């Protein structure tokens, strides 16, 4: 009887962890809220990207 109880408890734990891992297929609400980094060069890359988009007033900075 003791082995049967342990077997039932282990089966219940395995099923509950499977349900928690799989979930119901919904994505978290804030998953798409994070902006994609379109300036991989960091702050300097962002500054250079802004200069390129607006037309650089000083030619050596534009590269």
UniProtKB/Swiss-Prot annotation:
Tell me the superkingdom of the source: Eukaryota
Magnesium as UniProt keyword:
no
Q: Please list the disulfide bridges.
A: 56-62
Propeptide segments, given as residue ranges: 24-54
**Where are the D-tryptophan residues found in this chain?**
58
The ranges of region (Disordered) come to: 25-46
Instruction: Enumerate the UniProt keywords alphabetically.
Output: Amidation, Calcium channel impairing toxin, D-amino acid, Disulfide bond, Ion channel impairing toxin, Neurotoxin, Secreted, Signal, Toxin, Voltage-gated calcium channel impairing toxin
Could you give a GO molecular-function term held by this entry?
toxin activity
Result of changing residue 57 to V: Abolishes the very slow conformation equilibrium
Which source organism does the UniProt entry give?
Conus buxeus loroisii
The name this protein carries in UniProt is Contryphan-Lo
Expressed, tissue-wise, as follows: Expressed by the venom duct.
Any one annotated GO CC term: extracellular region
Q: What is known of its domains?
A: The cysteine framework is C-C.
Looking at the keywords, is Acetylation present?
no
Alphabetical list of InterPro entries matching this protein? Conotoxin (IPR004214), Contryphan_CS (IPR011062)
Q: Which residues carry this modification: Cysteine amide?
A: 62
More info: Exists in two forms, due to cis-trans isomerization at 56-Cys-Pro-57.
- Compartments in which it is found: Secreted
